[in-house]
Curated annotation (Swiss-Prot):
It comes from Lactobacillus acidophilus. This is Beta-galactosidase LacA. The active site is at 148 (proton donor), 307 (nucleophile). Zn(2+) binds at residues 113, 153, 155, 158. InterPro entries: Beta_galactosidase_C, Beta_galactosidase_Trimer, Class_I_gatase-like, Glyco_hydro_42, Glyco_hydro_42_N, Glyco_hydro_b, Glycoside_hydrolase_SF. The gene is lacA. GO terms for cellular component: beta-galactosidase complex. GO terms for molecular function: beta-galactosidase activity; metal ion binding. Pfam families: Glyco_hydro_42 (PF02449), Glyco_hydro_42C (PF08533), Glyco_hydro_42M (PF08532).
Length: 667
């Protein structure tokens, strides 16, 4: 990671929406909360370039000067995420076309075509002006390119670029026809010009484009769109580095996670990962923790929490206030899992337009006596005290869960068996097992090095690309422990089924083959017998034939009662477990008691008392334990931490932890 000089505490600031005479007062209020940074210029293109080639930086100059004079660290946006009206009028091809074949008009945001040469040219020209102007300002500590990339395009620009992309990948139409199995429904093509991008009028349907005739086409198009947006990022980054090679560059990732953009491929081009976090009020705490661990694992370094909400979120269906203490707990949860900044959207609440009811440091009341502001100021004080100690510390994990965007896409395109396949939910079933045991866990991709881990869990590894099976076999043969599940090893990278029984190329390492897969309909429960107890299961039940594997659990109902549901296979020096059904939480917990015991890895704390406990290690080897009560109920601090120091307060650790309480402890 690019080393920060201090722990950034701040967020998005939009002074261009306010009279100039209010800016100095805003900065004074921010300082009262120990805020030391501001993210600016994210959506200012219309102000900076009111007409093509006519630039006006006068207002931004003043904003930068005032923040610099106040010794704020500045995260400088490139303003390319929302386009001015004149651009739509003069260059209609810049507007993206949705999968229903409708071209967007001026309005909203995230509505540019990534393959529009006009958008690329105009964004590059603005970028050059911006970077040349501010490259020598030492208060600018990060360049923030665009904003929350997303929104696929299906226009003629993209269609032409997609054909070139396919030619480069498949070389011949014969190769493409074979990869996509285009003999189905007479889809065979004989010329590259016959390719049509997937859309509702062609091979995709459903409200969200969730159904597809040719999955290979749709998956390749998602890969292509992710690369197209990534190329825009690379273009802007190249311009920045030409004039300012030292200041690090990022763009903010978002979502649960964002399905449209393959962040694992993008991560290589980021100087630092940044993430926008907005958990819903009813989301379990482990879901946010998973996303933070994913962001940390993208570069195996601390990341930036680029956006979060002080209290209410504007766009969710229901946005209750964050309860007293909850804001601090949720922000420290990000820090506990690897964040080296705490930043909000936004610093000052807007009076109009979209997101005007989204919470902020300066609320509509414009008072500093409010509950939220007092909590923000208290958080600022704690970060000021503890930030230097936390900054740059890392998480060391011996367990890993595999998350892969090609599997994300292909798994949810499955046509048949059941409509209830949800990739993220399936991954979370397994992440929760480690979260509740306070076992540090990395979220890795299929290209990461498995040998760094004692246990690798790859749930619903539906798509196994060429070479991945050998990588898994080698890992287990050399002593690794591997877990996979139903809906794994079924197709290749073009979504064509492996023959010979599921899990295809994973049959050898798992020591089993699957004959059929039964769909469990809503409201139906299938029983699984494990260690003399019955457990409920659902979604899918694989009918398993063990070859070399031993049986750990069997079905206890339906016509396949008595057949294997869970198996364990010794393979070389290691072991592979196959879980042929979606065990409910109690049953999965019982199974993972066995699996984790076999690995020899222990929890950070055995008597966690329903507290979330994570650990970061400083460069000089000091261990920092983050103890979070992610509920409104009182909990008890584990006895292990008796006598430890809470670096947030400088006092000894306290035993009774009220709702949403946080301690960061060192011995």
């Amino acid at each position: 990671m690019t080393q920060l000089s201090r722990f950034l505490y701040g967020g998005d600031y939009n002074p261009d929406q306010w009279p100039e005479e209010t800016w100095s007062k805003d900065i004074h209020v921010f300082k009262k909360a120990d805020i030391n940074s501001a993210t600016i210029n994210i959506f200012s293109w219309a102000l900076l370039e009111p007409r093509e080639g006519k630039y006006n930086f006068s207002k931004l100059d003043k904003v930068v000067q005032q923040l610099s004079d106040a010794n704020f660290d500045i995260v400088m946006g490139t303003a390319t995420a929302a386009m001015p009206a004149w651009m739509f009028k003069k260059y209609p091809d810049i507007a993206r076309v949705d999968y229903q074949d409708r071209r967007h008009v001026f309005g909203q945001r995230h509505n540019f075509c990534p393959n529009s040469s006009n958008y690329q040219r105009l964004a590059g020209e603005l970028e050059k002006q911006l970077v040349e102007r501010y490259k020598d300002n030492k208060h600018i500590v990060f360049w923030h390119i665009n904003n929350e990339y997303g929104g696929n395009c299906y226009c003629e620009n993209c269609q032409n670029a997609f054909k070139k992309w396919l030619k480069n990948k498949y070389k011949t139409v014969e190769g493409l026809n074979k990869a996509w199995n285009m003999n189905v429904w007479s889809h065979t093509i004989y010329d590259w010009d016959e390719i049509v991008v997937p859309n509702e009028l062609g091979d995709v349907w459903g409200i969200k484009g969730s159904e597809t005739i040719v999955a290979g086409l749709s998956i390749d198009y998602l890969r292509f769109q992710s690369e197209s947006m990534q190329n825009l990022f690379k273009m802007e980054k190249k311009i920045i580095k030409k004039f300012d090679p030292e200041t690090p560059v990022t763009t903010n990732f978002h979502g649960l996670p964002n399905k449209m953009v393959d962040y694992q491929k993008w991560a290589k081009g980021q100087d630092i990962i940044s993430y926008d976090s907005y958990p819903t009020y009813d989301a379990p705490a482990y879901k946010a923790a998973f996303l933070y661990d994913l962001m940390r694992s993208l570069k195996h370094q601390p990341f930036m929490l680029m956006e979060s909400a002080p209290s209410q979120v504007n766009w969710q269906p229901y946005s209750p206030l964050k309860r007293p203490g909850q804001m601090e707990a949720t922000e420290f949860q990000a820090v506990a899992h690897g964040a080296d900044t705490v930043q909000f959207f936004r610093l000052k609440q807007a009076v109009g337009g979209s997101e005007k009811f989204h919470s902020a440091v300066i609320a509509h009341s414009q008072r500093t006596v409010t509950r939220v502001f007092k909590e923000l100021a208290d958080l600022g004080k704690k970060l000021k005290n503890a930030g230097p100690t936390i900054l740059g510390s890392k998480t060391k994990a011996r367990f890993a869960i595999v998350f892969d965007w090609s599997n994300f896409w292909s798994y949810e395109y499955v046509d048949g068996i059941t409509q209830d396949l949800n990739y993220v939910d399936s991954i979370l079933d397994y992440y929760r097992q480690f979260y509740e045991r306070n076992i540090p866990t990395d979220i890795i991709g299929v290209d990461d090095d498995f040998s760094n881990y004692d246990l690798v869990v790859a749930p619903v590894l539906y798509m196994v690309k060429h070479g991945l099976d050998k990588k898994i076999n080698d890992y287990v043969e050399n002593g690794g422990n591997f877990v996979t599940t139903y809906m794994s090893g079924m197709v290749n990278s073009s979504d064509n089924v492996y023959l010979g029984g599921y899990p295809g190329p994973l049959k050898e390492v798992t020591g089993i083959w699957v004959e059929e897969s039964d769909a469990v309909v809503p409201g139906q429960k299938i029983k699984v017998l494990m260690n003399g107890k019955d457990y409920d299961t659902g979604l899918i039940c694989n009918l398993i034939h063990p070859n070399d594997a031993k049986i750990l659990a069997t079905y206890a109902s339906e016509f396949y009662a008595g057949t294997p549901a869970v198996t364990e296979n010794q393979y070389g020096k290691g072991r592979a477990w196959y879980i042929g059904t979606r065990l409910e939480h109690q049953g999965l917990t019982q199974l993972f008691n066995h699996i984790i015991f076999e690995t020899g890895v222990e929890s950070l704390v055995c008597d966690s008392h329903k507290l979330e406990i994570t650990k970061r290690v400083t460069e000089d080897g000091k261990e920092l334990y983050f103890v979070l009560n992610m509920s409104n109920e009182e909990r008890t601090l584990p006895s292990k931490f008796t006598g430890y120091e809470d670096i947030l307060t400088g006092e000894k650790a306290h035993k009774d932890m009220k709702g949403w309480d946080v301690q960061v402890l060192r011995n």
